Amino acid sequence: MQLEIQVALNFIISYLYNKLPRRRVNIFGEELERLLKKKYEGHWYPEKPYKGSGFRCIHVGEKVDPVIEQASKESGLDIDDVRGNLPQDLSVWIDPFEVSYQIGEKGPVKVLYVDDSSETGCELDKEIKNSFNPEAQVFMPISDPASSVSSSPSPPFGHSAAVSPTFMPRSTQPLTFTTATFAATKFGSTKMKNSGRSSKVARTSPINLGLTVNVNDLLKQKAISSSVHSLYGLGLGSQQQPQPQPQQQQQQQPSSSQPPPPLPQQQQQQPQQQQQQQQQTSALSPNAKEFIFPNMQGQGSSTNGMFPGDSPLNLSPLQYSNAFDVFAAYGGLNEKSFVDGLNFSLNNMQYSNQQFQPVMAN
């Protein structure tokens, strides 16, 4: 009688789960089991299973069985809620060795549980499984792994050893991490970090692009400052000529007191000035050959030959086929913005009056 009542209770309660409070539904099942056992005392006939079947039937319809009403009252559930969640015109027969139900007056009678000693054990297990509500199999009790193989339906061809347990217990061993493995996990989780990101190529950010641009600008400014330094040193050398030798000073003293010599004497002084210009150009760095101007030779005056204009700082762009025009791209030296970027003052630069001597390789 205990097994048959349990099968009927599981079938009825399966309709009430997830619709009514679970705790009260459990109390409802306990009270219903207690009331059914009390009702079936003296009306249970294993020798004649169908004797007293109408008395043991539980009916829920327009009229609800008094056992259902009493169990709902004891559990604190409303009888209308219980009847509304159960199928209409539900009848459950609880007989010795068999439990069946019917939904509707003209519905088919379906067997939930049957116990026939002539059948094999596999068939009994199949009937026990079918005793639960097929529409709510999620409420089937979960057994331990040892008995889950026997309670599950047997596979065909008798391969019972290949049946896997339907429920595997979760491992109870605590998770342990070393310092290295814990550092490789995600923050707030035990999952490992994605290692695929480490193999990706680092992308260039706008900050990195800005740094490269600044470095290129600094390199350009350094090249411009070195070129202007060499050009300006060449202009000062032509304007402030080094101290001549005593013989040249004696030649210049009478010329300062006398009126300017005629044109033929100026033509005689041109070769000396050209030699001085060649010495000055040879004193430059051999790596700065692009600053040696080919049209400087053959000019009348050294200052006007290099930089034609009113003053040596009033530079005009020179025409060359393969040379880089610094002043056409960045402006003249008189512009304040260009001079400020060079980080030094051109007017305060000091140059020695000693004449540079060319280095001759043996």
Swiss-Prot record:
Residues bearing the modification Phosphothreonine: 204
GO function term, MF aspect, one: transcription corepressor activity
Motif Bipartite nuclear localization signal: chain residues: 22-39
Listed GO biological process terms: negative regulation of BMP signaling pathway; negative regulation of cell population proliferation; negative regulation of nuclear-transcribed mRNA poly(A) tail shortening; negative regulation of osteoblast differentiation; negative regulation of translation; positive regulation of nuclear-transcribed mRNA catabolic process, deadenylation-dependent decay; positive regulation of nuclear-transcribed mRNA poly(A) tail shortening; regulation of SMAD protein signal transduction
Motif stretch (Nuclear export signal): 228-236
Residue ranges, annotated region (Required for interaction with CPEB3): 161-220
Primary localisation category: cytoplasm
Cellular component, GO, one term: cytoplasm
Known outcome of mutating residue 234 to A: Not exported to the cytoplasm
Keyword Membrane part of the UniProt annotation: no
Alphabetically ordered keywords of this record: Cytoplasm, Nucleus, Phosphoprotein
Xref: SMART domains: btg1
Cellular location(s): Cytoplasm; Nucleus
Amino acid composition bias (Low complexity), ranges on this chain: 144-160, 238-256, 265-280
SUPFAM superfamilies in alphabetical order: BTG domain-like
Outcome of swapping residue 236 to A: Not exported to the cytoplasm
Chain segments carrying region Disordered: 144-171, 234-284
Source species, domain of life: Eukaryota
Quaternary assembly: Interacts with ERBB2. Interacts with CNOT7. Interacts with CPEB3 (via C-terminal RNA-binding region); recruits CNOT7 to CPEB3 to form a ternary complex required for mRNA deadenylation and decay. Interacts with CNOT8. Interacts with CPEB4.
Summary of the function given for this chain in its UniProt record: Anti-proliferative protein; the function is mediated by association with deadenylase subunits of the CCR4-NOT complex. Mediates CPEB3-accelerated mRNA deadenylation by binding to CPEB3 and recruiting CNOT7 which leads to target mRNA deadenylation and decay.
The name this protein goes by in its record: Protein Tob1
Species annotation: Mus musculus
